[in-house]
């Protein structure tokens, strides 16, 4: 049986989809698993033993009717038996329909029910994202201790050599940025949390975040902090993150990556988001003080309410 899965479009959500993929393989061990994903999340799925085929949508084909038709029709030669959509977009349902898949399974949202053959009941809004995906196959839990991201020996050797070249040992990964500006950690809070620390910090982020990373370094010039923003691909960053001592993370894709790899991860959340998108790794802790404000003022109060003591106690709890 050929089973296709339409991946979520964000790195964090892609990471949260990995338990779903593993459960599909457990349910159908002899099936061929095909992942359809955007280019910027493809690194999450590389070398996964449960994935037989990874089809990457080129960056230039993300939108438009012509591209949608082209992608959907190009999948017909795969003879897909079952197609799951882990994104709620209308476009994904059209692509599934055009693929000729016999069963097309997804939640009936955004008026796309016409293109789906099976429409499981939409779970409550406060169900965790990873469990929402599992609802598509009538599962309500998964084993968080399993491996979900896989690196080759060659990749890990590259990572160890790269860390050696950076002349760092036992470094701490720092992810202060997020796609949503409101989730980005305030500079003064970062300074408070790492003040007088003897750790070696590596800041991860995109090229557009490099200027902000330099500001963090300047504000803490007595500490060992190095910015890697924009210097490595997502896959390369993932390899380096897998070698860190622990990670301090905002509500971001990299935070989910470090957690699901198995790196001890402390994540900072606001506005009750940890309920739905908290990290799922066994060695992870979410600091969420969003209960302090009524009415909720989004992330203005809760992120700023997190103290150095909160961070230090979480580090002690999460480290082996």
Regions found by a protein language model. Give the residues of each.
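Catalytic machinery of carbohydrate-active enzymes
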Residues: 1-320
């Amino acid at each position: 049986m050929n089973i296709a899965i339409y991946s979520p479009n964000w790195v964090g959500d892609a990471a949260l989809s990995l338990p779903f993929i593993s459960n599909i393989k457990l349910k159908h061990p002899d099936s061929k698993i095909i992942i359809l994903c955007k280019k910027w999340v493809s690194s999450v799925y590389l070398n996964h033993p449960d994935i037989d085929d990874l089809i990457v949508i080129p960056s230039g084909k993300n939108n438009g009717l012509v591209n949608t038709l082209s992608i959907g029709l190009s999948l017909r030669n795969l003879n897909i038996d079952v197609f799951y959509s882990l994104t709620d977009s209308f476009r994904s349902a059209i692509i599934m329909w055009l693929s000729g898949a016999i069963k097309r399974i997804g939640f009936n949202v955004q008026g796309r029910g016409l293109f789906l053959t099976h429409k499981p009941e939409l779970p409550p809004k406060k169900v965790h994202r990873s469990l929402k995906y599992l609802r598509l196959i009538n599962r309500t839990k998964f084993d968080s201790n399993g491996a979900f991201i896989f690196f080759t020996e060659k990749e890990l050797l590259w990572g160890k050599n790269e860390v050696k070249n950076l002349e760092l040992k036992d470094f701490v990964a720092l992810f202060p940025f997020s796609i949503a500006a409101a989730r980005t950690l305030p500079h003064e809070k970062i300074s408070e949390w790492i003040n007088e620390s003897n750790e070696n910090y590596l800041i991860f982020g995109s090229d557009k975040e490099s200027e902000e990373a330099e500001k963090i370094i300047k504000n803490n010039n007595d500490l060992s902090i190095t910015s890697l923003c924009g210097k490595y691909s997502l896959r390369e960053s993932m390899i380096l993150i897998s070698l860190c001592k622990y990670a301090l993370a905002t509500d971001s894709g990299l935070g989910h990556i470090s957690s699901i790899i198995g790196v001890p991860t402390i994540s900072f959340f606001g506005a009750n988001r940890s309920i739905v998108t908290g990290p799922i790794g066994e060695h992870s802790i979410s600091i969420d003080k969003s209960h302090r404000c009524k009415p909720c003022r989004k992330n203005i109060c809760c992120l700023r309410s997190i103290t150095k003591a909160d961070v230090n106690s979480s580090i002690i709890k999460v480290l082996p």
